[in-house]
Amino acid sequence: MAVVVAVVVVVLVDTWISGYFLFRNASNDPLERADAIVVLGGEHDGREDFSIGLAKQGWASTVVISNPYPDGDPVMERVCHDVRGDDGPVEVLCLVPSSLTTRGEATMMRTLAAERSWNKIIVVSWQYHLPRARLIFRQCFSAEPGVTVMQAVPRRYQFSPLSWEFVYAYQWAGLAKAIAQGECS
């Protein structure tokens, strides 16, 4: 029994320490002008407004918001319309990916980019999601360096240590799943 407890403790500590360094301290890519900004689904934590703000500043002329939310979602109703930016109009598209996953969002963006001849996109998500999103977009959007620019929603995460442990375990599992799935067809 003591061996089992020791193994569990080691796994939990290892998950927390490695997760802290890989996920909690994930870095943004330097912002570059892009064809579009894609907002990955998740919680309404300011990511929609942050992304539209980037577009208004001229970083892209189109914002694609992944919309896995139910009809009548008040945030989506507020943000799902074109706006005016410093460089002219900003197109806002709210689309439901065929699969409500990061992989589904990357595949949706690959199709949209091909249809619209886009070469570069900015991807917005949680800071701790960036490593996994970066891998999945390399697998399913483009493996070419510099084609996807990863940006975290600028916010502070007020999680308890136990909540962080769950976040890290979830991200590690998602990373393992993405590696196992490999490239999108």
Which residues make up each language-model segment?
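Hydrophobic membrane-insertion alpha-helices, especially the h-region
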Residues: 1-17
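A transmembrane-helix-recognition feature enriched in membrane-embedded lipid enzymes
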Residues: 161-185
